[in-house]
Regions:
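N-terminal targeting leaders characterized by basic, low-complexity, disordered sequences
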Residues: 1-53
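Primary recognition of N-terminal secretory signal peptides and signal-anchoring hydrophobic helices
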Residues: 55-275, 304-317
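Glycan-recognition patch characteristic of GH18 chitinases/ENGases
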Residues: 303-417
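Short, acidic/polar
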Residues: 329-345, 408-423, 471-479, 611-624
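Conserved, mostly hydrophobic/aromatic
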Residues: 351, 432, 489, 531, ...
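Substrate-binding surface in catalytic domains of secreted glycosidases
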Residues: 361-368, 416, 442-577
Length: 652
């Protein structure tokens, strides 16, 4: 009984153990739980081990995949950061400023870092070299190269590399400094500083900053590591901003660009350019770079200024409009024609005889001045402004004029001689007509203008200067400076087409005059400008070039012109008569505002743009509309007598 009970109990326990442990579970409905006993138990164990091994393999694969994924994420992050993250690379500051040696001084002038190549030989001075260091430090003092001083700070300083002297022209004379000296002459007074004013390195002059400031409306400060001077010489409105938080100024606009310097919260910067996400700025200590726009605030306009008294150059302008006529006098005997040439004139205020010229390249002048001529003109109620030329005398080339003017002693010699001759003849003024000025001679010519102006005014002589119509190629005549130191600036609004032109054309079209006046008035006040007009024109003769001629000219400017031209200058009456003699008829040309005629003869074509009362009136209207100081005519004896009444209607 007990055995059966025990057996029954065992079976019963076996069923209980074989069940899943929840309602509805049976062998038929699910896999039974194995206990490890019997054949079926051993088979279940193997299956469990197999499952465990599979699970481990899956876990390993999953782990490896996670590791690979993490590596990929890290790699992608590194690539992303490399491409888009901020760089901590610092710029080489000495390279940024162009510093090569321990005594070099970097210059930041009006928010611009001046590089070595920017201060090299591209200027008009013959003392320039190809490798000018912008600034230097000598014996603890800071110096600026002359080329940089002239081009970027104060163009009135003048360096004579031949005679080793630095000049600065004041209204009453020159300030003069010799090299390696702490002494200088201000007009006639000797002064000194506690530093050497002028140092030289070959032909390169370096001028001490405090001495420059004495004659210049500028402020400067100096920073170290590296040595640099921050100079401001332009005043007026600027844009500033405040730094929101500590950040970097970078070389270019972008987070990968090298860092120039750090700026602190509340630092003030000058804003130069707005490039959306970045601002180009200048820091107070002289770095010009870029800051993220979001790090700036309180952006605003400010006016900056400095108390400084600019030198005032005295002027001897007349209290009436100028009606001046040049008188082309070629020898002493020609002075006797003054009565004849003035006989038919009316309304003239000034006569300008061509009396003085350069005799040689040593600073001597030739003169055919005549006191009797002056007395007659004065009796007729006119002033005499004697013309001083660099041609039709002993010299007649660009090189000869350059060779004369680039020496201070030669300039002083010719200035003294021409003023003395003018005073001796009793003239009222000097009219400077130097037309052979090359670009390299420009700075020397302008210095002549300054110096001669001072000496004229010291001798009660009106000083006027003749100029071509302003063009880019003659900008070295420096109309702006002329307008400051001279009494009158004369624009010769003729020779639009000359004897050497490759094609026929007007000597003085209306647009040529208008353009000349417009460009001049950008640099010189109207009450100092005199417009020169012609009493002559050119009769042109043109023939078609042969194939042989075109072949010979191949590769030259002349080759682009199909006709060969020649011309001769004619006075107003002679020009009009040439049209009549040819049986031609002149017609009004609206474009040039001149009467134009052409005719065929002598195997070619003649063309002429006439100067007559009609064309002159068109020019006089332009002069009047622009409220200029007056008019000048080239030249006496070539006009129609009727023009004087016309001119008087427009020039009172």
């Amino acid at each position: 009984m007990d055995k059966r009970k025990g057996s029954t109990h065992a079976r019963s326990r076996g069923r209980v153990e074989g069940q899943s442990g929840h309602p509805g579970s049976s062998r038929r409905k699910g896999r039974p739980m194995t206990t490890g006993r019997g054949r079926n138990g051993r088979s279940g164990t193997r299956r469990a081990k197999k499952v465990n091994r599979a699970r481990k393999r899956r876990n390993k694969i999953l782990f490896v995949m996670i590791i690979i994924l993490l590596i990929m994420i890290l790699a992608a992050g590194a690539v992303f950061f490399k491409r888009y993250g901020s760089s901590n690379e610092e710029a080489d500051k000495e390279q940024y400023y162009g510093i090569e040696n321990s005594d070099d001084l970097a210059l930041i002038i009006n928010n611009e870092v001046v590089k070595k190549e920017e201060s090299s030989a591209k200027s008009s001075s013959d003392s320039s070299t190809d490798s000018v260091i912008p600034g230097k430090v000598f014996d603890g003092q800071y110096y600026v190269a002359y080329q940089v001083l002239r081009d970027k700070i104060n163009s009135r300083f003048y360096w004579d590399a031949n005679e080793r002297v630095l000049l600065y022209t004041l209204p009453d004379g020159n300030v003069s400094v010799s090299e390696n000296s702490s002494e200088y002459t201000a007009v006639n007074e000797t002064k000194s500083e506690d530093y050497v004013i002028l140092k030289t390195d070959g032909d390169i002059a370096y001028i001490a900053l405090p001495f420059i400031q004495e004659y210049t409306n500028m402020e400067y400060s100096v920073e170290q590591e590296p040595n640099r001077a921050i100079i401001t010489s332009k005043w007026g409105e600027i844009e500033t901003a405040e730094v929101k938080k500590d950040t970097q100024v970078r070389y270019l606009g972008g987070v990968k660009s090298p860092i120039l310097t750090e700026v602190k919260k509340s630092d003030k910067v000058t804003v130069l350019e707005d490039e959306d996400d970045w601002m180009k700025v200048t820091t107070a200590d002289g770095y010009v770079g870029y800051i993220k726009t979001k790090f700036l605030k309180n952006q605003k306009k400010e006016k900056i200024s400095r108390d400084f008294t600019e030198p005032v150059y005295s002027n001897m302008t007349e209290d009436h409009s100028i009606n001046m006529a040049w008188h082309n006098v070629t020898n002493v005997a020609a002075n006797n024609a003054v009565q004849q040439v003035l006989a038919s004139t009316s309304g003239l205020t000034t006569i300008a005889p061509t009396w003085f010229s350069l005799a040689d390249t040593e600073g001597n002048i030739s003169s055919i001045a005549d006191a009797d001529y002056v007395n007659y003109a004065h009796t007729a109620g006119m002033e005499v402004w004697a013309v001083f030329r660099d041609f039709h005398g002993g010299t007649n080339s660009y090189d000869e004029t350059y060779e004369t003017l680039r020496y201070t002693s030669k300039r002083a010699k010719l200035e003294d001689q021409v003023v003395a001759a003018a005073v001796a003849a009793g003239v009222d003024g000097i009219n400077l007509d130097f037309e052979l000025i090359s670009s390299k001679c420009g700075v020397h010519y302008v210095q002549l203008v300054r110096e001669l102006s001072v000496k004229c005014h010291q001798n009660n002589l009106v000083f006027s200067v003749d100029n071509y119509v302003p063009q880019s190629y003659n900008s070295h005549y420096d109309l702006k400076e002329q307008g400051i130191v001279a009494d009158y600036v004369v624009i010769m609004a003729y020779d639009e087409h000359t004897e050497g032109s490759y094609e026929a054309g007007s000597v003085a079209s209306i647009s040529y005059l208008q353009d000349g006046i417009e460009k001049t008035l950008k640099k010189v006040s109207a009450d100092k400008v005199i417009a020169g007009i012609p009493f002559f024109t050119r009769l042109w003769f043109e023939t078609a070039k042969s194939p042989e001629q075109l072949s010979e000219e191949a590769g030259t400017e002349a080759a682009s012109y199909p006709n060969k031209v020649s011309s001769k200058a004619l006075g107003m009456e002679e020009a009009a008569q040439s049209v009549v003699n040819a049986g031609a008829t002149a017609q009004w040309d609206e474009k040039t505002q001149q009467n134009y005629a052409k005719w065929s003869a002598d195997g070619g074509t003649y063309r002429i743009w006439l100067e007559d009362a009609q064309s002159l009136e068109a020019k006089l209207k332009v002069i009047q509309e622009n409220k200029l100081a007056g008019v000048a005519e080239w030249s006496l004896g070539r006009e129609e007598s009727s023009v004087w009444k016309l001119i008087s209607q427009y020039v009172n």
